[in-house]
């Protein structure tokens, strides 16, 4: 809204990004207690897995879920004020955010209604993810310009692969994989949101560099016209995420639920697609990929041998079973996530 006023100060990306971040953060602190209280009154409690860590059944009982509502409400309001709402990348990102959040909301609602950890049936969840990812990646492919289907590789300046129409299923795979990986990782207070903050911060840097023709030319990365609005979008997401972490830090007063985790993964995955950072995203999301692989390995090995590789999957529960405290697991995973982000950002210059 402010951007459309045409004020000179609002033309500066860094100014709008800073205030989109601050606005979303402060709004989270203001409306957070009200949303938490409202969810408690509605008895929207987190439904815990019976096969999860036993201490979670007592420690996390009664904590409201659907915290994604808090994140995305604050992000959306901030974006209305600070973004160019006519920018195509802004519209794609909002579509992904609302679509995947809606899917997660249905899943959370069914869990609460049925009082079970089984919400939306897996096949219906996948169908929903396929539909939303197909339309969002399809729109990106149509409006994204001549290089939209090109994959750029770190370390190698001249090596590129143009997938053509196959970029659409490739992009869908990234969105769905990211969405489900974030969902699997959201099991401890502050874990998923803290890692998301690290990735969001890294993507803000990448978005700013790609929006500037001078920096893009110097670093030999694509200059993406219009990607400056991703800086604003991700800034608002950063502020909303910090605000949510304020209440989600141990001991959590609210959990993000599938409303938050499914959408967060898809949002960051879509940002990576727009910024032509698909390969870098696989490094940035290293912790999420490791968590997902731990589940896949556990299931496959157990089916064949009836033995478990890990004491419990996903991997963060394995370390809990080894005796690590919840905060030890969370902070150590944050550190590893930060290292992955540093590695990913360092590859931008090494070409």
Swiss-Prot record:
Membrane association type: Multi-pass membrane protein
A Pfam family matched in the record: Glycos_transf_4
Enzyme class: transferase
Keyword terms of this UniProt record: Cell cycle, Cell division, Cell inner membrane, Cell membrane, Cell shape, Cell wall biogenesis/degradation, Magnesium, Membrane, Metal-binding, Peptidoglycan synthesis, Transferase, Transmembrane, Transmembrane helix
Enzyme Commission code(s) on record: 2.7.8.13
Cell compartment(s), UniProt: Cell inner membrane
GO cellular component, one term: plasma membrane
Main location, first listed in the record: membrane
GO MF assignments: metal ion binding; phospho-N-acetylmuramoyl-pentapeptide-transferase activity; UDP-N-acetylmuramoyl-L-alanyl-D-glutamyl-meso-2,6-diaminopimelyl-D-alanyl-D-alanine:undecaprenyl-phosphate transferase activity
Required co-factors: Mg(2+)
Spans through the membrane: 17-37, 62-82, 85-105, 130-150, 158-178, 190-210, 230-250, 254-274, 279-299, 328-348
Catalytic activity: UDP-N-acetyl-alpha-D-muramoyl-L-alanyl-gamma-D-glutamyl-meso-2,6-diaminopimeloyl-D-alanyl-D-alanine + di-trans,octa-cis-undecaprenyl phosphate = di-trans,octa-cis-undecaprenyl diphospho-N-acetyl-alpha-D-muramoyl-L-alanyl-D-glutamyl-meso-2,6-diaminopimeloyl-D-alanyl-D-alanine + UMP
Domain of life of the source: Bacteria
Pathway assigned in UniProt: Cell wall biogenesis; peptidoglycan biosynthesis
GO aspect biological process, one term: peptidoglycan biosynthetic process
Biological function: Catalyzes the initial step of the lipid cycle reactions in the biosynthesis of the cell wall peptidoglycan: transfers peptidoglycan precursor phospho-MurNAc-pentapeptide from UDP-MurNAc-pentapeptide onto the lipid carrier undecaprenyl phosphate, yielding undecaprenyl-pyrophosphoryl-MurNAc-pentapeptide, known as lipid I.
UniProt cross-references to HAMAP family, sorted A to Z: MraY
Family, as annotated: Belongs to the glycosyltransferase 4 family. MraY subfamily.
Full protein name: Phospho-N-acetylmuramoyl-pentapeptide-transferase
Organism: Borreliella burgdorferi (strain ATCC 35210 / DSM 4680 / CIP 102532 / B31) (Borrelia burgdorferi)
